[in-house]
Structure formats: C-alpha cells, structure tokens
Amino acid sequence: MNTIAPDHYKTESGLQVWDVTRYMSGNMAQAFQYVYRAGRKGNEAEDLRKAVAFLEDWVAHPDVPRAVLPEGIEPTDGPSVGGCLLLDIPDGSQWKVQPLMQIISADSYEGEAMNGQPFCGRRLITNETLPRLKKRIAELGGVDG
C-alpha cells in the first residue's frame, strides 16, 4: 500500500479513483470517492453518509459549476475511465456501479435525456442516487432510508 494512493482507491488492474475524479467538480469527486471505497475501508454506512452529504450539498447549490474540463480533454474521457474503473468492482459490490455512473453523468453530461427532455443531473441525484444510497445505509443498519 502507498499512503498517497491507498489500496481502497485502486482496482486490480491498477486504475485509481483519481483517474476519474480529476475531471469532476469538488463535491461530486468526494461523493464518488466515498461510494467507491464504501466497504473497502472502515465503516461502509459512514462512508455512504459522507457521500450523501456531498451529494445533497451539490444539489442544494446549482450556482456551483459542474465538472470543468481542461483544454484538450473530451467530456467522454472521465466517464470512459469511470466505466473501466467500474468493470473491476468485485461481485459483492456491484450495487455501487449504478450510483457511481449516475454521479459521473450528473456532473459531466449535457444534452437530452433518453425521453428527449433536457438532462438534469440534480434531478437524477435527487430522485435516484440519493434514495438508493439511503436505502443501502438502512440495509447496513444505519438510520437513513
């Protein structure tokens, strides 16, 4: 283990969480990291509560910019790496894949939703991601749910 890049943020293939989060806005990067490491280090419910706090703060502040990509980086770079990172999630943690992809999408995707309406990342987080994480916390014996 390297203290700068601990094992709970790495995959078997060597990808690291920061390979995705470097392209994300602050709150969303923190939420992604806490969901990713949940159950890999310390108390899973506590990590999920921290992720929920970052997501709720992101939803509450629409004036804060979403992911800002440096020149030369395509919007698909982070999600593409994110997809590769999620392929390495162990079977027992597959529940994380959907909320992690929703966090990436909410922070970086602009355009239309599948129904043809404008995509709204904050609605996705509020209506799908937060309830899913709170349900998981409740299943772990936490208070949320």
Predicted segments with their positions:
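Intrinsically disordered, low-complexity regulatory regions
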Residues: M1-G145
